[in-house]
């Protein structure tokens, strides 16, 4: 169950809008006897909803496939499902009402990961969905048992069109497919789904990014696997390490090309387009494209002709946004901070800024990983070192100088565990002298 385990963790780590079962690899002993490597994981039941959402197990509908009840009943689902199926969702008012019944972003996310990663053991199986029994609650899907995905069998190979094989044969025969197809009749939702699909394959499903998660998962259990196979036999460590795991790497490397082709074919899109994003001057701001914010600029991603792309700019301190312009599509300056264009061919889009800080600007805070996250905006490039002090001026840690370009720079610094209180971070260079106070709380 390697695939299911590492995908669940990766989805959680990546902040996807999914309800997935967390797991931890363990070495199992029963009455002192070694039973090998196992996955300790959450169970897809009402207590998952209690511990993750605080939902009362006696005040929830948790349903399975088309007719099975885990807890609750089908009364609310049948009513909301009937609304979707009997109304024209091309009308935005009707779609927005449907979106108060169903978490449409969660539904899109589920169809993306299941079809994009070739999990064919879904919709007719391994399908659970839930809603708290409150007026404002919406239906969401649980994601579990994805061990058939990513090349486990021939029909989940990287070249298989799982999007079409999930939707076309089951249309009219499966409530969940019918619900999703009905939502897709709305232009904006269809654009959202396709762009979100592209966003994920431009980021977390890139081979070089995805591979790191496989590497980490293999490394966690590899030392115990020879003993595991000594206990259980087939297929044996050598076959697992030299044939089974390489299938995953081969899948990761090849899947994005076919996944995009699947989307293009299913929705009848004309062609793919490669978009390059950057700011001028560099480091003047961030660009949000659809649902993602690239960590570094310039950045490239693949999207689709026929599906408008949304771009939003956020200036860094000291800069003022002026306009967008591109080589082929946005040929005249567009001064709107948030824009939406259909790109018919490869293009380079630049967000232009004026101004810039006269003096260095520094910010700092403790992030969720308990690292010191800093932002430093420089009027000029410099070799900058950072120093951490307590409020009495005692040096706690020094970080050696490194080159930082003009504009905004963000860094995460590993610091020791420190007690609650106020601290000072300084940045020093040939043309940089700036400090800032920040708070460490419990």
Indicate residue ranges for each PLM-predicted region.
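Conserved ATP-binding subdomain of kinase catalytic cores across diverse folds
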Residues: 1-72
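Middle-to-C-terminal accessory/interaction subdomains
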Residues: 25-29, 34-38, 49, 66-278
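Surface-exposed interfaces of beta-sheet-rich extracellular modules
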Residues: 228-229, 308-335
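Extracellular modular ligand-binding repeats in secreted and cell-surface proteins
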Residues: 290-319, 343
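Conserved "repeat-terminator" motif of extracellular CCP/Sushi domains
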Residues: 336-356
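Glycine-centered coil/turn sites that cap beta-strands in beta-rich domains
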Residues: 356-388, 410-417
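C-terminal tail/sorting-segment detector
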Residues: 374, 398, 411-412, 416, ...
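Short, glycine-anchored, charge-dense loop/turn motifs used at functional sites
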Residues: 388-396, 423
């Amino acid at each position: 169950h390697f695939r299911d385990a590492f995908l669940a963790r990766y989805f959680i780590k990546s902040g996807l809008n999914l309800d997935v079962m967390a797991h931890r690899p363990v070495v199992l002993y029963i009455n002192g006897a070694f039973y090998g490597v196992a996955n300790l994981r959450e169970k897809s039941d009402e207590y998952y909803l209690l511990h993750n959402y605080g939902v009362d197990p006696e005040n929830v509908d948790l349903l399975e496939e088309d007719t099975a009840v885990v807890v609750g009943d089908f009364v609310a689902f049948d009513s909301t499902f009937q609304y979707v199926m009997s109304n024209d969702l091309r009308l935005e008012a009707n779609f927005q009402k449907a979106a108060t019944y169903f978490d449409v972003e969660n539904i899109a996310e589920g169809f993306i990961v299941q079809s994009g990663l070739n999990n064919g053991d879904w919709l007719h199986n391994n399908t659970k969905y839930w809603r708290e029994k409150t007026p404002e609650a919406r239906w969401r899907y649980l994601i579990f048992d994805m061990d058939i995905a990513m090349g486990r069998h021939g029909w989940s190979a990287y070249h298989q069109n799982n999007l079409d094989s999930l939707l076309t044969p089951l249309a009219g025969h499966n409530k969940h497919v019918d619900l999703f197809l009905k939502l897709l009749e709305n232009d904006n939702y269809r654009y959202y789904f396709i762009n979100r699909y592209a966003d994920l394959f431009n980021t977390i499903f890139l081979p070089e990014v995805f591979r790191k998660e496989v590497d980490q998962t293999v490394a966690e259990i590899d030392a115990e696997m020879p003993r595991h196979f000594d206990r259980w036999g087939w297929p044996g460590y050598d076959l697992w390490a030299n044939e089974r795991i390489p299938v995953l790497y081969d899948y990761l490397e090849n899947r994005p090309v076919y996944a995009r082709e699947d989307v293009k074919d299913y929705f009848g899109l004309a062609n793919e387009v490669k978009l390059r994003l950057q700011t001028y001057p560099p480091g003047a701001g961030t660009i949000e494209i659809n649902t993602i914010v690239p960590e570094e600029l310039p950045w490239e991603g693949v999207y689709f002709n026929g599906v408008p792309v949304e771009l939003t700019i956020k200036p860094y301190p000291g800069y003022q946004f002026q306009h967008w312009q591109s080589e082929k599509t946005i040929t005249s300056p567009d001064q709107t901070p948030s824009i939406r264009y259909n790109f018919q061919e490869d293009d380079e889009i630049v967000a232009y800024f004026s101004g810039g800080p006269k003096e260095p600007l520094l910010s700092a805070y403790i992030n969720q990983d308990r690292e010191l996250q800093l932002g430093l905006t420089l009027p000029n490039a410099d070799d900058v070192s950072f120093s951490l002090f307590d409020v009495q001026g005692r040096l706690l840690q020094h970080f050696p100088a490194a080159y930082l370009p003009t504009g905004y720079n963000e860094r995460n610094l590993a610091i020791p565990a420190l007690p609650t209180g106020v601290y000072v971070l300084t940045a020093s260079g040939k043309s940089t002298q700036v400090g800032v106070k920040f708070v460490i709380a419990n």
